Structure formats: C-alpha cells, structure tokens
Amino acid sequence: MNRRDLFGTGLALAATGFMPRAEAAELPRGGTLPRGPVTLYLEFRVAPPENAAAMSAIWELAASLARRPGFLHLSLKQMVGDSTMVKNYPESYKGILAEAYLDGLKAGRQPYFYALFIRFSDYPALLASGADPAFAHEIGPHLHAVAAAPAGPIRSKQPMAWYQGVFETIAAGNRSAILRDVPGITTFLRQPTDAPDLTTVANHVFIEEADRAKFDHDVVALLKVAQETYQPEDAADLIGQPGARDNRWYRKAVSTEILRNAFPDGTLRAYLMHGVWDSVWDHENSHLDPRFQQAAGPVGAAVVIGPVEPFYRTTFSAGAI
C-alpha cells in the first residue's frame, strides 16, 4: 500500500496542496478523539489513461458509503489553478493562474488532481464505514502513473502517493448564517453548495500547535468577514456585484468553512480554509478589500507553512440514501 497521510513528521506543502507522506498509517483510534461531524479529506493524482476507471470506482465508493450509518455527503473536486492574491502578489497578477493547472493537464504535462471530501456525522461512524481502507483498495489501483513509450504505455509498479487526514469543521457559513454548533454544522455538511458552475478554494496551512486556541479565534473572525463583506459596499442586494479582471467588486462567498486537522502532527496542526464562490474574480477581489486584509493579518502571522490555495471545480457530489 502506498497511502500517505497527515500523521508523519517533516510536514510540507506541495504546489497542489498538502505534501503526500512517505509512510503509511491507519487512522488513529486512541487519544483525544474528535467530537461532532468529521471529514475524511484526500488529495490524489490520476493519470489521464486511468481517469475513467478511477471516476467509476469513486462513484461506486460513494454509492456504498451513502448507505452507511452517519454518512452525510461526498464531494469530488478537480483542481484547475491557483490563487495569486492569497500570496499578496501585485494586483496585476490577479487571476493569472486561475486555470493554469487545467491548461497543464490539457497540454499533457500534468495528471488530474482531485480533492475528495467524505463527511460523516462523527468519528466512530467514519471508522465503522471503512472509508479509509475502501479508498486504498478500490481507488488506489487506479492511481498508477502512466508514461508513453514506443512499445506502448508503461504503468508504474506502485500507485502515486496520496494524502489523507481527518478534519473537524470548527466553523462554517453561508449567506444566511455563521454556524458554530454541531446541529448547524451537520446540516451544512449534509447539504453543501457544490454546483459545478461555482468556484471552490481550499487554503492549506500549518500552524504551531501551541497557537491553536488563538488561531481558532482569529480564523473564525476571518471567516465571518469573508462571508459577510462584499463590494461595492452600497450594493442594493446586500450581496455585491460580480468581480472581474478590471474591477474590485465581489459578491459574498456562497459558503465558507474552517477545517482543522483532528490530530496534531508533532508540534504542528493542519488547517483547510474551504470556500465556495460565484467566480474566481469574486474570490481574488475579496483579498483586495481592506476589511479582509485587516482580518487576515493575525491569521497569516500564525502560519508557519503555507498558504497554498488552489481553485477547484466540483466533479460530482453525493448525499446519503
């Protein structure tokens, strides 16, 4: 098995997100366990010749998990590009990498890259579902690299490494409310806004475990700003106007979510800032708003690895049966 997870040492971020690990490990079952809903989060690459089979296997996995007690939702999202405004690059670089990864895929220079969110009502339900070994056994065989050769394609002996971890949602929001309680977050995860025409972002960072309490406070405050602000500020609909390359307008985030690794990795802790926006431009312009920048200051100051914030499009999603 060539599974990689969150729980080793030597953490890093790749250009596409969390760095796969060199060693395999089962999901932890002891220590302080998470309470409330959890997400088994995975990032993995698929060679183009393997993509159809991999997608079929994920559909079958979703259909199986949908019948498991405690299952809430599954979303598969394909990476298409990267945010530049999260890096504080000059505004002239806004949106320049929005579809760069997708262009690399089309040019035959990159594999498919996916993020998979598997949501359960609680940690025991996730463990009992077998989602972790099921991914390894059912999707893992389709993750081999494939190289062209004169005599025909060559398939790697081992699957390409993938990343996985269990995350807790510590806060979420939509255009109606900011959610911190278990019932509200459970409903949010069961009924996400995952339409394919929307833009997903997932900002990957690590902080020092000792800073977790303050970071949680600051990152939830940032979520509130991202969820409630818009431009122009006098927009009659209280949502904002569509962002574009040549303006600084943006509509409120469609939804926002802060996911925290349920387990520390040595002295570090991983977070995902997961948002859904009407467009890339809405997201990028939100980073130019002084209100967002002020709220982001304390969050950025605590980050020791990151940020890496890819853009994704939802490939498919499935709820409980």
Mark where each language-model region is.
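Short, low-complexity disordered leader/linker segments with a strong preference
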Residues: M1, M19-E26
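N-terminal secretory signal peptides and thylakoid transit peptides that target proteins
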Residues: M1-L13
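Hydrophobic h-region of N-terminal signal peptides that target proteins for export
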Residues: A12-P20
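Short S/T/G/P-rich N-terminal loop/turn motif that feeds into the first structured element of a domain
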Residues: F7-G10, A25-H137, A145-P298, V304-I321
